[in-house]
Amino acid sequence: YGEIRFDFNLGTNANPEDQYFLEMYTLADKNNLIVQIHPNKGQLPVLERLLKKYPNVIFLAHVMPDVKKEIGKLLRTYDNLYYSLDAEIHYIYGYQTIQDNKGPTREEYLKFIRKNFDSLLKEALGNWKQIIEAHPNQLTWGSDRWYTWHFDPEVGGLVTEFGRTFIGHLDPAVQENFAYKNAERMLQDR
């Protein structure tokens, strides 16, 4: 179905429960579609209401690093919630709180990730390894991209290296699920 983003840093963000979106979810529910959702801070209760109301929709949430524990609780409760780990663990959109909604340059990112690769990997594993291993069928690796330079081969190679290294540190019993099988299953079940 596509991604619905509710956390733009400019202007007023849309409400995931606006009638416009409810009609989309209803259509997705009738047709067993996947909706990737990028909630804003404070919208976790809204996400839970949507999970309850639309049980035939797979909600693929991502970039909610401030509510990791709560995501774990929702994963235990709702089979129709999946979570994609991507930009939030390799900082492709920036490593400062807000970089004026434009992120770092290609050169700044490459320098930052190379310099901090090991510490970022340790941080990512500390934040997510336990959650992934507790919910081995609902989390998946992603490679979220936005800015033009995100598609640069050198950047893509480094993001891939980070992802593979991260996956290599997970329990071998969950590595394939997280790397690709959960995504395959999510798509095949549709």
Named regions from a protein language model:
Residues N15-W141:
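Catalytic pocket-lining loop regions of alpha/beta-barrel enzymes
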